[in-house]
Regions:
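C-terminal helical/tail subdomains of lipid-metabolizing enzymes
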Residues: 218-223
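Catalytic cores of NTP-dependent nucleotidyl/adenyl transfer enzymes across multiple folds
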Residues: 32-202, 206, 225, 229-237
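Short helix/strand-capping connector loops at secondary-structure junctions
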Residues: 202-216
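Catalytic metal-binding acidic patch
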Residues: 1-37, 41, 77
Length: 239
């Protein structure tokens, strides 16, 4: 987000699950809970209002927003349930799972992600590119933000998260192979455009490697391809 601070408040006592194939709650000794996500979100909101005063705390779609004042900075607080993924490693052990987060947006959209794996994979790629990967991510996000401000792209579809995931799929030798950022950005756009155009992107995942990037998302591969073309022209590479 564009806030100064992002905080996830995850509840572990109540959790959602992706079970191993053919398995269910009873196989792991779990019981259903009647504690809803909306009840939890309301409790977190009340706690924030008690701490920061009601007029500074309000609902966003996925997060609770805290406005800045002279005593604290602007923040996004994301209430979530723990997500336990047993499916990925076909685990039948209740204590062996990949941890993610599960939340329900105000629109009703169910959101799952895996921030710990996202972070670990991002660090690994950054290390393997001599710390150039995260720099390229920042540059590409900045370009995207400027394009949104100039009304050259749709920020609701071309999100910062999508941009980061696209850059994650740029090969390390492309990220490290050029002496200027101008050329690196140019070659990254060329690579991504060609891969999507040729259909080599269908198995791409998020940075976490847990969820497909172009399946059942609010963006499509056509959106990403069009953004790359628009960015190419926006940066003057086509001149």
């Amino acid at each position: 987000s564009e806030s100064d601070v992002d905080v996830c408040v995850m509840l572990r006592d109540t959790f959602h699950t992706d079970y191993a194939q053919g398995k269910g709650r009873e196989d792991y000794g779990f019981k259903a809970s009647d504690f809803t996500f909306q009840e939890y979100r309301n409790l977190v909101k009340k706690a924030l209002q008690d701490k920061f005063r009601t007029e500074y705390v309000y609902d966003g779609n996925k997060s609770l927003k805290i406005d800045e004042n002279t005593y604290h900075v602007k923040a996004d607080v994301v209430p979530s349930f723990q997500l336990r993924n047993y499916y990925y490693e076909n685990s039948l052990d209740p204590n062996k799972y990949i941890e993610g987060v599960w939340l329900q947006a105000k629109t009703g959209e169910i959101v799952k992600n895996y921030p710990k794996r996202h972070k670990a994979n991002g660090i690994a790629k950054n290390n393997n590119t001599n710390y150039q990967y995260k720099k390229l991510v920042r540059i590409m996000k900045h370009i995207k933000n400027e394009m949104v401000e100039d009304k050259k792209t749709d920020g609701d579809k071309i999100t910062s998260f999508l941009v980061e995931c696209l850059v994650y799929h740029v090969p390390n030798n492309v990220i490290t192979g050029y002496s200027t950022w101008t050329e690196t950005v140019k070659q990254a756009i060329i690579y991504l455009y060609n891969e999507i155009k040729d259909g080599h992107h269908t198995e791409w995942c998020e940075v976490s490697d847990m969820l497909y990037l172009f399946r059942n998302r609010k963006w499509t591969d056509e959106d990403a391809e069009q953004w790359l073309v628009t960015a190419w022209n926006y940066l003057g590479y086509g001149e």
